[in-house]
Structure formats: structure tokens, C-alpha cells
Design a protein with these regions (language model features):
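Conserved phosphate-chemistry cores used by DNA topoisomerases
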Residues: 1-177
């Protein structure tokens, strides 16, 4: 089923190291074409969903990429704070915004990025692409294991665990509407 997706096939071919199941069983980490595979997704809930699905794919079918430290998640900002006086600052989550509000006197303009596509080329380079200034999170096997487990539980056929998860975590949800 996974290999029916054209984008997944393209990714596998781009990596150059094969796929461990149903694609010739020819996974060979020594043929990897890139030192870093960077997942770039929006800083919102939808981006987190996409990242979780990709981590699940890597964990289940190409775990060596994670074990050998090749998978990273880019951390794009969620906000840009621009004070009347002083330097603008990128903020990566709501906690950072709350802290910024408490520690900065005076008025400031706040821009919220709904997605990477809302940034102009210069902003995207400065915040997410430039190796000198970007923030990358190395994916560890436990991150991928948890992503896979949550994906299986939320998308699987077993209703009781999903219902329980929703009830237990409903108050923690950050709605992006």
C-alpha cells in the first residue's frame, strides 16, 4: 500500500538506498545519497501530522536511516515578533510567544506563519534553510517509535484505544482554526 504512493516512491528513489519491504528488499544504507534527510513541514498541527507520518514510514521501512543519525526535523518558526525598537525575533511555539510578551515592553507587531508557503524566499532561507541559522532536531529512535505507535493507534481499526486517547488528551489539543 505504501508503495502505491508516487511521492513515497520518488523519495525512496531519491535517497538511493532502497526500501526494506516489498520493493525488492534491497535496502543498503551505504548507497544513501544524502547525509541529512530533513523533514520540512509547517509549524502547526497539520505539519506535525505530516512529520509523524513520515517518521512512521522511516521507522517501519528504513529504520537504519534513524539509527545512523540521518533523519532530522526542520524547526520553522510559528511567529515573527517585530518591536517598534530593537531586533525582530522568530518564535517557535506559543510558549515562546508568551515569554516574549512578558519580557518585552512596548508595542510590537506579530506575524503568524500559517505555513512555510507564506514565507518569502528570504525568510525561508533565514529561518529554515540556511545551515548557519536554521534549527534542526535530530530524530532519535524513540521519537520514531512513539510516532509509529501513535499513528497505528489513531489510524488502526481498534476503536477503544483511539477513543481513550482522545478523551485523555482532548484538553491538551491546540486547535488551529
Amino acid at each position: 500500500k505504501v508503495l502505491a504512493n508516487a511521492e513515497i516512491k520518488t523519495m525512496i528513489n531519491a535517497f538511493g538506498c532502497g526500501f526494506s519491504e516489498g520493493y525488492g528488499n534491497d535496502f543498503d544504507i551505504s548507497k544513501l545519497r544524502y547525509d541529512k534527510i530533513i523533514i520540512m513541514a509547517d509549524a502547526d498541527v497539520d505539519g506535525a501530522h505530516i512529520s509523524t507520518l513520515l517518521l512512521t514510514l522511516f521507522y517501519r521501512f528504513m529504520p537504519e536511516l534513524i539509527y545512523e543519525g540521518h533523519v532530522y526535523i526542520a524547526m520553522p518558526p510559528l511567529y515573527k515578533a517585530m518591536p517598534k525598537k530593537g531586533e525582530e525575533e522568530y518564535l517557535y511555539d506559543d510558549k515562546a510567544l508568551e515569554k516574549y510578551r512578558k519580557t518585552h515592553d512596548g508595542p510590537f507587531t506579530l506575524q503568524r506563519y500559517k505555513g512555510l508557503g507564506e514565507m518569502d524566499a528570504e525568510q525561508l532561507w533565514e529561518t529554515t534553510l540556511n545551515p548557519e541559522t536554521r534549527i534542526l532536531k535530530l530524530v532519535e529512535i524513540e521519537d520514531a517509535r512513539m510516532a509509529s505507535s501513535v499513528t497505528e493507534m489513531l489510524m488502526g481499526s481498534e476503536v477503544p484505544p483511539r477513543r481513550s486517547f482522545i478523551y485523555e488528551n482532548a484538553t491538551e489539543a491546540e486547535l488551529d482554526i
